[in-house]
C-alpha cells in the first residue's frame, strides 16, 4: 500500500510545479504606478537638458541677416575709370571696357568727333570683370561737343565730369543737357568753361565791315525746316548761294552754323537732328566754295526758341538754322 501511495503522490507534485512555471498572477498596483511615472520623469529630465530657455541663453534683439548686394546699385558705384580727351585733331581714349561690344558702342558714338584727319590714340583695354558706362546712346553728347576743341569727358564711379573751353554758354549748356538726357542716373558735373570775349581786331572795311548784317539781309532770318526734316528746299539753295558769295568775299571770316528744333521729342533726338540741319547747310556752303575750316556747326536742340512751341506756327519757326559770324 505504501508503494501505491508513493506512486500516487508523484503526479500531484509534477502538476503543482507545472502550475507554478506557467501561471502568473496580475501585477500589483505599485508596479503599474512605476511603469507610468518613470517614463514621465525621464522625459522631463530630457526636456530640461536639451530645451534651453531663450530668455537665459538665446540672443536678444534682432538677429543680423546677410542679404545679397543689389547688382544694380553696386554697378552704379563701381563703373570703370574712363577718360576721353580731345586736343585739336587728336582724341585720346584711356580706360577699360568689359567686352568689344561696349567699346564699339563708344567708337560709334564718337562719329561726330572722328572727322577725316582726326588722330585717335586708343588705350582702351578689355577686362571682363569691369562694369563700364553705356555709350550706346551717347552720340548727342559728342555731337554737341564739336565746337569745344579741348573737350574732355571722365567717368569715375557714378559721376561723369565734362571739361573744356566752349565758345559760348549755349555750347556749354548743350553738352550738359545731352549728357543728362543720355545718362539720367549718373551725376553730371559740368566743368566746361566759356572763353572770354576776344579783344577786338582792326575794323573790317568794305563788304566785310558788317558781314553779319549782310548775311541777315540775304537770308531774311533763320532758314526754316519742315517737321522732323533736315532737307533744304529750292528757295533755300538760292539763299545759300548768295550767303556763299558773301563769305567768299571775306576770306578771313569765320561762321558758326547753329541748328535748332522745336520742343517735340527728347533732347536725345533733338540734338542729333539739329546738328544734322546745321551740317547740311555747312556742306552746301563748302560745295559752293567756302573754306570748310572756316565753318563750325553745332546742334543745340530745342533751346532758345524764337517763337512759342504751343502752336504749330511757332514750332515751325523754331525748326531752324542760324548763321552766326564769329
Swiss-Prot record:
Q: Which family does it belong to?
A: Belongs to the outer membrane OOP (TC 1.B.6) superfamily. ArfA family.
Q: Quote a single Gene Ontology cellular component term.
A: plasma membrane
Which GO terms label this protein's molecular function in UniProt? metal ion binding; peptidoglycan binding; porin activity
- Residues forming the OmpA-like domain are 212-326
- Keyword Transmembrane helix assigned to the entry: answer is yes
Q: Which organism is it from?
A: Mycobacterium tuberculosis (strain ATCC 25618 / H37Rv)
Name of the featured protein: Peptidoglycan-binding protein ArfA
Cofactor binding note of this UniProt entry: May bind Zn(2+) via residues in the BON domain.
Q: Which cysteines are joined by disulfide bonds?
A: 208-250
The annotated consequence of residue 277 to E reads:
Loss of peptidoglycan-binding; in association with A236
Which residues are listed as membrane-spanning? Answer: 30-50
Q: What is the effect of changing residue 236 to A?
A: Increases conformational stability of OmpA-like domain. Does not alter peptidoglycan-binding
Its quaternary organisation is: Controversial; may form oligomers, or not.
Region annotated Required for protein translocation to the outer membrane, chain positions: 1-73
Amino acid at each position: 500500500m505504501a508503494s501505491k501511495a508513493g506512486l500516487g503522490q508523484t503526479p500531484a507534485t509534477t502538476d503543482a510545479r507545472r502550475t507554478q512555471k506557467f501561471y502568473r498572477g496580475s501585477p500589483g498596483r505599485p508596479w503599474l504606478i512605476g511603469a507610468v511615472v518613470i517614463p514621465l520623469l525621464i522625459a522631463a529630465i530630457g526636456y530640461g537638458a536639451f530645451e534651453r530657455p531663450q530668455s537665459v541663453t538665446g540672443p536678444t534683439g534682432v538677429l543680423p541677416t546677410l542679404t545679397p548686394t543689389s547688382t544694380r546699385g553696386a554697378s552704379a558705384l563701381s563703373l570703370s575709370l574712363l577718360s576721353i580727351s580731345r586736343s585739336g585733331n587728336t582724341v585720346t581714349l584711356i580706360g577699360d571696357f568689359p567686352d568689344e561690344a561696349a567699346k564699339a558702342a563708344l567708337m560709334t558714338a564718337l562719329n561726330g568727333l572722328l572727322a577725316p584727319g582726326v588722330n585717335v590714340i586708343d588705350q582702351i583695354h578689355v577686362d571682363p570683370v569691369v562694369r563700364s558706362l553705356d555709350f550706346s546712346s551717347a552720340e548727342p553728347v559728342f555731337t554737341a561737343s564739336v565746337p569745344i576743341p579741348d573737350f574732355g569727358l571722365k567717368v569715375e564711379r557714378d559721376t561723369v565730369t565734362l571739361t573744356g573751353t566752349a565758345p559760348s554758354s549755349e555750347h556749354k549748356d548743350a553738352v550738359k543737357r545731352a549728357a543728362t538726357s543720355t545718362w539720367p542716373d549718373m551725376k553730371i558735373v559740368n566743368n566746361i568753361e566759356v572763353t572770354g570775349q576776344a579783344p577786338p581786331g582792326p575794323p573790317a572795311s568794305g563788304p566785310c565791315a558788317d558781314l553779319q548784317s549782310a548775311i541777315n539781309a540775304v537770308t531774311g532770318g533763320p532758314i526754316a525746316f519742315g517737321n522732323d526734316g533736315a532737307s533744304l528746299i529750292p528757295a533755300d539753295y538760292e539763299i545759300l548761294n548768295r550767303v556763299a558769295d558773301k563769305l567768299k568775299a571775306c576770306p578771313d571770316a569765320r561762321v558758326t552754323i547753329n541748328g535748332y528744333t522745336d520742343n517735340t521729342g527728347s533732347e536725345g533726338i533733338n540734338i542729333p537732328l539739329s546738328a544734322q540741319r546745321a551740317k547740311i547747310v555747312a556742306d552746301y556752303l563748302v560745295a559752293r566754295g567756302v573754306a570748310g575750316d572756316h565753318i563750325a556747326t553745332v546742334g543745340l536742340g530745342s533751346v532758345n526758341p524764337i517763337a512759342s512751341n504751343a502752336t504749330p506756327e511757332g514750332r515751325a519757326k523754331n525748326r531752324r538754322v542760324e548763321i552766326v559770324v564769329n
